[in-house]
Amino acid sequence: IRCFITPDVTSQACPDGHVCYTKMWCDNFCGMRGKRVDLGCAATCPKVKPGVNIKCCSRDNCNPFPTRKRS
């Protein structure tokens, strides 16, 4: 499987059986910059703390950097 990986947001090969993930959360600059985003791959979908959103998927490049909605 190939997943996008931060910080460069490049597509990289991950080991067989791994999943891609997109993890998003707010920090002190959330109001100005939007949510922080971490892209990667892992053996299983990572467990996250409350307030952190995570989406896992198992297709090539299924975790692109999310686009920010314009108001």
Curated annotation (Swiss-Prot):
Superkingdom, taxonomy of origin: Eukaryota
Expression sites by tissue: Expressed by the venom gland.
Transmembrane segments: none
Pfam family, one: Toxin_cobra-type
Predominant localisation class: secreted
Keywords: Acetylcholine receptor inhibiting toxin, Disulfide bond, Ion channel impairing toxin, Neurotoxin, Postsynaptic neurotoxin, Secreted, Toxin
GO terms under cellular component: extracellular region
Gene3D superfamilies: CD59
InterPro entries hit by this protein: Snake_3FTx, Snake_toxin-like_sf, Snake_toxin_con_site, Toxin_cobra-type
Sequence similarity: Belongs to the three-finger toxin family. Long-chain subfamily. Type II alpha-neurotoxin sub-subfamily.
Name used for this protein in its record: Long neurotoxin 1
